[in-house]
């Protein structure tokens, strides 16, 4: 069954009430970096238990963790990677004990999602984020370049260690695509950037715990037929980011959920057709009048529009 969730920080805020008032009671959470006690790490059992209970006290069930312990050494194959991998194994073991079924991770070395503008004007004076490869610095990062094949080798090493732990604890590893799906960036290869590469990931270690986060804003930059891509991955999809963009991998802007390049209704039908059983959350919403752009893409009021739009599509497809 497809259910709507929201990404909510573990510290209570007005967004908690807004989400509940919009009918959302499933939380996608981070890790409790800001609330650990002396001697604790955020991926250990007690901090995670307290975080889960805090969500529950606010009326939410924690269903996905979408944050990572430090992983750059693992991605680059540097000394210390085994220690980083061990922290991931600890996280997965504790997620299993607490009944948190999905861990969303990514394989972007050195930097995460990249934008060159976080206040591009959009509909009615709202603001969205955008990307233009020509506005990026050209020099390599301080760690230097790394090839795509090196990243594949390091990912396989990582999965060899981590996937058995995920399987033993019934936690799905859910790979998020590169954002943007473009390679290289500043000399750093990016491998989770195409439909074929995601097929390679799934085939590398076939397992119902080796899965895909279908982030629509990235996947729609990889294909002009996103509903077909959804159907092709089928049961390998464990988590969905529902958003849209306009443009190409080298130059794009994010959009309101009803104003991008993608047929969002057709996507919702595709999730129904594959029998998607998991959570979908709105992602990267516009900043609207009366809200802060300090955390661009995560405007509280913009999320309310997205939740309502998604709920309407869901009702039309699943009950229409």
Model-derived segments and their meaning:
Residues 136-151, 177-187, 291-293:
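Active-site-proximal beta-alpha loop/turn segments in soluble metabolic enzymes
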Residues 1-5, 10, 16-23, 56, ...:
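Histidine-acidic metal/acid-base catalytic patches
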Residues 18-35:
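Basic, amphipathic N-terminal segments that precede the first structured/catalytic domain
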Residues 27, 176, 215:
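Active-site glycine-centered loops adjacent to acidic/histidine catalytic or metal-binding residues
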């Amino acid at each position: 069954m497809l259910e709507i969730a929201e990404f909510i920080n573990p510290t209570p805020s007005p967004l908690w009430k807004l989400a509940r008032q919009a009918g959302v009671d499933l939380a996608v959470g981070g890790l409790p970096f800001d609330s650990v006690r002396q001697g604790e790490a955020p991926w250990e059992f007690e901090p995670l238990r307290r975080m889960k209970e805090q969500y529950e006290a606010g009326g939410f069930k924690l269903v996905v963790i979408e944050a990572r312990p430090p992983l750059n050494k693992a991605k680059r194959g540097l000394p210390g990677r085994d220690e980083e991998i061990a922290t991931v194994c600890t996280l997965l073991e504790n997620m299993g004990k607490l009944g948190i079924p999905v861990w969303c991770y990514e394989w972007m070395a050195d930097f995460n999602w990249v934008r060159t503008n976080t206040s591009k004007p959009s509909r009615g004076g709202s603001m969205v984020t955008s990307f233009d490869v020509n506005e990026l610095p050209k020099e390599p990062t301080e760690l230097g370049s790394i090839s795509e094949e090196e990243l594949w080798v390091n990912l396989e090493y990582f999965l060899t260690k981590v996937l058995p732990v995920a399987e033993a604890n019934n936690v799905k590893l859910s790979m998020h695509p590169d954002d943007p799906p473009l390679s290289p960036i500043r000399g750093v290869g990016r491998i989770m950037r195409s439909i074929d590469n995601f097929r390679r990931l799934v085939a590398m270690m076939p397992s119902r715990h080796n899965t895909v986060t279908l982030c629509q804003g990235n996947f729609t930059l990889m294909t002009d037929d996103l509903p077909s891509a959804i159907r092709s991955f089928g049961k390998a999809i464990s988590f969905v980011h529902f958003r849209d963009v306009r443009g190409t991998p080298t130059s794009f802007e994010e959009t309101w959920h009803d104003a991008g390049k993608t047929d969002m209704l057709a996507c919702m039908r595709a999730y129904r057709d594959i029998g998607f059983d998991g959570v979908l959350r709105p992602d990267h919403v516009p900043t609207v009048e009366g809200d802060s752009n300090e955390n661009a893409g995560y405007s509280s009021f913009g999320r309310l529009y997205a939740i309502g739009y998604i709920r309407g599509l869901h009702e039309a497809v699943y009950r229409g």
